[in-house]
């Protein structure tokens, strides 16, 4: 759905489905948007490097993806329920990169003027089954190679729902789920871009500009 969303804004722009090789022409694009797929990439640095190479000088990269704070409640209740019902643990929610780690990848990929920011939202659901159904409809369920292949026992999710409603309640007898979206931006290096000053080379004091006393 995200590919079609951007197609409404830029119908003539080439669109690439999530895959290891993005197939972008080197140095051919003014803008590359990596929309809500970087958290699934096996090699996120490689994805960013490909995007950087595809940009013209002073071209802009924009990225958005689910961050590490997403689904923290679901991870916790599934962990508790699995220990109680099955006596062990297995990865049931895929790990996602946090803001600091993913922001640092921009510099490694060769982008100038990198910026990383995050947006957190709380969404409520009737129960864990509606939450998991929403994830399934979005194509965001567990695809880890190390996941359990056998169908889990029904009472695992029944127990998880009980824990969820007790531990993370929301208004009107609902449950809450955190969603974090990390946003990245970076520019293809170009001589025309502003450069950071050398440390200690400032000609004016910030305290003077703000009209405050420096301690």
For the regions a protein language model found, what residue spans apply to each?
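Class I SAM-dependent methyltransferase SAM/SAH-binding core
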Residues: 1-27, 31, 45-46
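Short, glycine/charged-enriched secondary-structure capping and boundary segments
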Residues: 9-12, 46-48, 76-79, 129-130, ...
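A short glycine-rich, Lys/Arg-flanked "PGG" loop and its adjoining helix->strand segment in the class I
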Residues: 45-60
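Conserved catalytic/acceptor-binding region of the Class I
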Residues: 62-130, 138-151
């Amino acid at each position: 759905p995200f590919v079609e969303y951007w197609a409404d804004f830029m119908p003539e722009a080439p669109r690439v489905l999530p895959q290891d090789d993005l197939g972008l022409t080197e140095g051919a694009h003014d803008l590359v948007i990596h929309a809500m797929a970087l958290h699934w990439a096996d090699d996120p640095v490689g994805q960013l490097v490909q995007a950087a190479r595809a940009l013209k000088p002073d071209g802009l990269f924009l990225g958005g993806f689910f961050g590490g704070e997403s689904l923290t409640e679901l991870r916790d209740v599934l962990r508790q329920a699995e220990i109680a019902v099955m006596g062990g643990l297995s990865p049931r929610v895929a790990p996602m990169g946090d803001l600091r780690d993913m922001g640092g990848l921009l510099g490694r990929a060769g982008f100038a003027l990198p910026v990383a920011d995050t947006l957190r939202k709380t969404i409520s659901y009737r129960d864990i089954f509606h939450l998991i159904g929403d994830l399934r409809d979005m194509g965001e369920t567990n695809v880890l190679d190390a996941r359990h292949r056998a169908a889990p026992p029904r009472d695992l999710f029944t127990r998880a729902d009980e824990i969820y409603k007790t531990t993370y309640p929301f208004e009107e007898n609902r449950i809450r789920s955190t969603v974090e979206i990390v946003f990245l931006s970076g520019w293809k290096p170009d001589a025309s871009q502003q450069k950071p000053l050398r440390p200690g080379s400032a000609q004016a004091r910030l305290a003077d500009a703000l009209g405050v006393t420096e301690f």
